[in-house]
Structure formats: structure tokens, C-alpha cells
Amino acid sequence: MPHIQFLPPEPVVLVSRVADDPDPAGPGLHVAKVAVGDCTIVDARTPCAPLQGRFAVWTVALQLHSPDTPRSLTLRKRYSDFVRFRERLLLCLPPPLRRAVPPLPPPVPWYDAWRYSDVNLDRAWLAARRAGLERFLQQVLLNRALVAAAPVVVRGFLEPPAAHRWVPVRA
């Protein structure tokens, strides 16, 4: 039986906007640097779901501006997380700002869908996808106008999924 490695997301703490903060994006959303690093290949096949495949989880490193000290943040995201982020971003941005949102690297072509795992996990394919994801995040997260126009969507992308949030139980 293959070993499945669970990669829990690291906790994210974003600073809330205070009443006297003139920047609508808030102090916690000033990104200074974005880098998409290597990916981890996750094997999702189980005896109950043998047709599930393997997929890549990307490591995203962010350097945030902070009034006190610079903070860094490391995220782990699948390609589908980037797709959802871009879709939500385009839905909430005004038309003039939508043009500033670059396209994502393309998904596996339909004619290669029958060998999806082979194509999607090819080293050259992954290198091109990593470069495209990094370009996308740099053009979005380093653009203060985009972040200010959609802070809720940006925060949603930077926070771990609800299923991974720890909620204390009250006794």
C-alpha cells in the first residue's frame, strides 16, 4: 500500500485593517516578494479509490511588509487553488483592473488527458508550470491596486482551507 503523506498548511496570521489605516488593503497584505518553489508530488491512490492519481502541491514563499518587522509566509497550494483564486479575483475586480490579471499556465491539453499523470508530472512540464504560477502571483500580489480592490479574495487565498483550520473546543 502506498504511503500517503499529509502536508498540513502552516498557520497564517494576517493583520486586520484598523479604522485609522488609510490603505484599504490593510497592513497585512503588503507583499514584498513572492516565489513559487519546488512541488511535492502527493499520491492520492488508495485501495478504495485506485483510479485517483498523483498531483503536485506547490510551495509558495511570501515576504510581507510589516510595520514592525518583515514577516515571511509559506503556503502549499495545488494548481486548482490558483485557478479558483484567479476566477474569484476576476469576478470581484472592476473591468479596468481585470486586464492586469495575467493568465495561468495552461492545464494538461485535452488530447493528453488519457495520460494525465504522465504529462502532469513531467519535469519540463512542472518547471514551465512553476514559472507560470510564479509570474501570475508576482503580477497579482505585488500589484497594490489589485490587492486593495480584492482584499477578501487575496486573504482567502493566503489562509489555509477551512477544513484545516483549528478551532478550539470550549469545555
Curated annotation (Swiss-Prot):
Domain PX: 1-164
PROSITE patterns with a match to the protein in the record: PX
Compartments where located: Endosome membrane; Vacuole membrane
Keywords: Endosome, Membrane, Vacuole
CDD domains: PX_YPT35
InterPro entries hit by this protein: PX_dom, PX_dom_sf, Ypt35_PX
Gene Ontology MF terms: phosphatidylinositol-3-phosphate binding; protein-macromolecule adaptor activity
Keyword Transferase: no
Gene Ontology terms describing biological process: protein localization to endosome; protein localization to membrane
SMART domains registered for this protein in UniProt: PX
Domains: entry comment: The PX domain binds phosphatidylinositol 3-phosphate (PtdIns(3)P) which is necessary for peripheral membrane localization.
Protein name listed in UniProt: Endosomal/vacuolar adapter protein YPT35
Protein's organism: Eremothecium gossypii (strain ATCC 10895 / CBS 109.51 / FGSC 9923 / NRRL Y-1056)
Gene: YPT35
